[in-house]
Amino acid sequence: MEPIPSKKGQYFGRPLFYENKIILLVADFPEKQLRILSYDPETEAISTLATLPRSITKDCYNLQLKLSPLMLVRQGQDNTLEILFPMQKTYAMDLQESFRFRHGDELYFETWYEDPDYRDEIVIRDFHTGNVLKRLPGILMTTPGGDIWMLD
């Protein structure tokens, strides 16, 4: 079954399951658009949640859909996190930080260090300012049911 057929010049991002639907990112280079599509497996209906101009970001390197709420983000090689949808915001990050998810007014990142011993940290930043609120030892793990565990 192929609910959303591909065309030449398109890139499909990794799908998410959100609100009982499969959410897909489609970067359509010939059309110069980024589309966020929703597929309802029960009704087989496809709807467009957002159509964004390709020019919304300087490149499509590491474009990803994240939660919660549903967001389109780009984590570039310049140590920034760009939220491109549903609003536009940019945050500075540390060198090895990786964005995982948003929960309310908090952004959750993971980072790692080798100084000289290897260790992982969870970095919690303020959504409005990007300032670090907390650093905790450990990693974040998402269970098959969608729960997120902090493991030390």
Task: Name these PLM-found stretches.
Residues T57-S68:
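Charge-rich, low-complexity terminal tails
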Residues R14, T111-E114:
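Generic detector of ordered secondary-structure context
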Residues M1-K7, P30-I56, L72-F99, Y113-D152:
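Surface-exposed loop/turn elements that mediate protein-protein interactions on large endomembrane-trafficking
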Residues F12, D59-Y61, Q96:
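Short small/polar-residue motifs
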Residues E2-E19, I23, P53:
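Blade-loop segments of beta-propeller domains
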Residues E19-N20, L67-L70, G104-E106, G146:
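Short coil/turn segments that connect the beta-strands within blades of beta-propeller domains
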